[in-house]
């Protein structure tokens, strides 16, 4: 199992699902996380091919390299399944799966629009290049056009070995730029981003800003349950089930 993200709670659940299902089937499973480092992700895949694994599960592979990597693995006689990975066209024998990111966006960002009656100044937490992020961005742009009263002030994001910490720093800088009353809400396209935003809101005393997100974890639920929590909504599918 090779995933182009770090060891956040969502990834932990995804991997746990794969390990649990693999154990039931009698498989021996190795897991590799590349923390959003495309070069490292490709190295992991090439190593798996050279080591002649029987099967490979890829998650969060990006353009322009993923299709060629998948074809290389298939040509080597390896069974391949991909999740939220940028594979172009149909490759015989390859299982391709993804979330319904348009619905996730409509439910989470759509709730923000409803809560603010179609008028709000917002910050978006997002990064380009990952297939689910691109699909969420497309759905978001459609909703923005339908709701001209929603104004995007900033769009920030970082995929690294410390997504939460890096995002908290970026959001903290934005909070310093916009005084109270200038930002109504933050919309996160990934809960790891939202965890960082939550940290920044609490540390800077800016919990008047409401937080909406996609994806869920046990940590998220704890933060949402805290007294006076600004985290209002998170919409998700079960990452453990996806991994399985």
Name each region found by the language model.
Residues 1-244:
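A residue-level marker of the well-folded mature domains of exported/periplasmic proteins
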